[in-house]
Amino acid sequence: MPDHSLFRLRILPWCIALAMSGSYSSVWAEDDIQFDSRFLELKGDTKIDLKRFSSQGYVEPGKYNLQVQLNKQPLAEEYDIYWYAGEDDASKSYACLTPELVAQFGLKEDVANNLQWSHDAKCLKSGQLEGMEIKADLSQSALVISLPQAYLEYTYPDWDPPSRWDDGISGIVADYSINAQTRHEENGGDDSNEISGNGTVGVNLGPWRMRADWQTSYQHTRSNDDDEFSGDETQKKWEWSRYYAWRALPSLKAKLALGEDYLRSDIFDGFNYVGGSVSTDDQMLPPNLRGYAPDISGVAHTTAKVTVSQMGRVIYETQVPAGPFRIQDLGDSVSGTLHIRIEEQNGQVQEYDISTASMPYLTRPGQVRYKIMMGRPQEWGHHVEGEFFSGAEASWGIANGWSLYGGALGDENYQSAALGVGRDLSTFGAVAFDVTHSHTKLDKDTAYGKGSLDGNSFRVSYSKDFDQLNSRVTFAGYRFSEENFMTMSEYLDASDSGMVRTGNDKEMYTATYNQNFRDAGVSVYLNYTRHTYWDREEQTNYNIMLSHYFNMGSIRNVSISMTGYRYEYDNQADKGMYISLSMPWGDNSTVSYNGNYGSGTDSSQVGYFSRVDDATHYQLNVGTSDKHTSVDGYYSHDGSLAQVDLSANYHEGQYTSAGLSLQGGATLTAHGGALHRTQNMGGTRLLIDADGVADVPVEGNGAAVYTNMFGKAVVSDVNNYYRNQAYIDLNRLPENAEATQSVVQATLTEGAIGYRKFAVISGQKAMAVQRLQDGSHPPFGAEVKNDNEQTVGLVDDDGNVYLAGVKPGEHMSVFWSGVAHCDINLPDPLPADLFNGLLLPCQHKGNVAPVVPDDIKPVIQEQTQQVTPTNPPVSVSANQ
């Protein structure tokens, strides 16, 4: 006859759980449920009183570790939820919703201030929020709460209100981006080796983020010429480019920033300064109200290093393979004029500037967005220039989609003021118009003369999402500036050195457009900028991409794309056309033809691209360039410790080159730390703790990262003020590891080090028999926990227990009624057969009081008085 002990062990606790979690709410069913106790097949004198479970929705008083779901959205962490018996009717039980838990609901301020509490203000008084329903679904380890939206703050998919924002934990961050290149000339030119890098180090203390940015370069050139002037040349540089600190002000939906910064304004042109600012943080707004993140596009003729800088400070650097590229992960906090430098492996350099677009400065009705800043302008190298300045700007949502905005900026000799109006046109988008007036007093002779200059600048901007057409006009705008109009940056140059202004803006047109025609398999992308000047010729930059996906017989997902581009800088223009045709080759590979025509260099290549897995891909190209054979390869791997890119190029009769790019960082906290990959230097990250279990795969942002030997991993580049999720890939767990909790969430403030812990059990599995000192066994439903407070087994009605996470010599405790009653110690070494009834004596602890938080003791004491002594509350693990 088969042994059904294991079956009873696994199924009996769930019979109780399902009965307890049937339909708990503030509205009780009139009909009771009757149980047949013979179903449990209890032996001996074992007794369990099931009368209390006959009330539908009844939950046995005790502590339950549950995932709280509010209106079908899980909160970030699991909570210990205490159930207490009803005051008037012990057959009913209620969940204790603590003030800390209720604070996560995101209630409106007037609702939260009028809440009433019971049990010495430790539990929310039931029945006071009309329409609120609470259900316990113990089979899913969940507390399901339904709350009318009228009680809650404004929400948006994957965006949480401020009450759920997490400042993270204190710690140290050190991020870096390193690029190395070596180049050998075959025609007697110079050989060169170059290393460049930038990064951020910093400290998090509570809500404060303190950072320091660095950048460095090393270049060694060796001439292959035989003349007497040839020789080696070495250039190297290291500098700390910026010191700064900031913190979030959630109650104001604002950010306080101190130190060296770049003026980011929705109205005025930016410049470097040292000082402080308080500003409404667009990142704290719902995604549909946030600003525009810069989109940088270009074409690399060979494998190239792309550097994005602003006023001399490197803010992004990476390597890209030959062909069109787009950089879209700078974040919406980057604004102003950006300088793009593309260094090709063949030695050519492309440079151009882009002006980042800004959304119309609109605000929700009744709300105000603002910026207040003050300090002193700063040149490169921490040198302060100019007088003390101050400025402010604001946008006020009046009503019916109208917004009024304006601002002022200046010092003793320079003042500018702006006034504008914006309109939300609903289905037709949003439009804004503003006028800025500047008054400049020049005390000494300059290229502009001496005296006062007054000028105006006019701007109109438009933005629209076409959701039904799967397209978006991200930004379209026009700006006209009079000849005597000056920005703060131009005034500083004139007053400091009297230098001639070059590039005195007259008109600027800019537009970014993206559209997908899904049914036709066509996508279009356009980025266009045109500048006219009072003192030099106009400048036009554009990038147009057209792609078409189609099926060709049995070959599916064939694509053809064409890119036309023109970039101009210092009267030097780079323009041309890039054509690509690709088709699948196997499951994860493609073959392609690529042609690049223009700027005096024509090239064509046949390429092979293969994606090895989610983290790794490579590309090989063979072709001709300037009638010479060329071969290049590119390899990229998103590792747990760093992102690694490798490249190699050979151009017949001209040069051979190779490149290496590393992007990563280190995060260290009191909970532990890890090395990791990253792209956003000094940015927000999530430290994962897998209870000391190594090689646990964690998915969060991009390819999976694996926990290190200490069971820690970091998910980097997570979104600020956005509901981020990380989860364990259960299909790739190490052998003898189990995850009883595999998903965590976090909504983190900017720059935070979030911390989340997974319940992971590592070790062997065993079937054991537990016996107390008097020969009896622990009661049915007793929990076996390890020293990490993880439940590793439940006792059945015969004292049998199926254990997980078994390790030689490990200590465990057996709990019932919420108390650890006895201890067991596993043998060392473990027997070869762990499924042959391993006997584990349980040593009695004596009279041990329940260990419960002080703030919940009144609840536990009350429930204990109302529970029959022969049937103590059962502490049920939600993870079983």
State what each model feature region is.
Residues 2-18, 28-290, 599-667, 677:
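Post-signal-peptide, soluble extracytosolic/periplasmic N-terminal scaffold domains
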Residues 60-69, 73-83, 692-702, 774-788:
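Short, ordered, surface-exposed loop/turn motifs in non-cytosolic proteins
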Residues 68, 296-298, 686-690, 764-773:
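A short, amphipathic beta-strand motif
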Residues 80, 703-712, 789-800:
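Short, acidic Ser/Thr/Gly-rich low-complexity loop/linker segments typical of extracellular
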Residues 88-97, 330-335, 711-738, 750, ...:
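Short Pro-Gly-centered beta-turn/loop motif in secreted/extracellular proteins
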Residues 164-228, 368-443, 471, 610-616, ...:
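Conserved, compact domain cores that house catalytic/ligand-binding motifs in diverse enzymes
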Residues 165, 193-207, 231-250, 386-400, ...:
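Feature captures outer-membrane beta-barrel proteins of Gram-negative bacteria and organelles
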Residues 176-180, 212-216, 256-262, 372-376, ...:
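Transmembrane beta-barrel strands of outer-membrane/channel proteins
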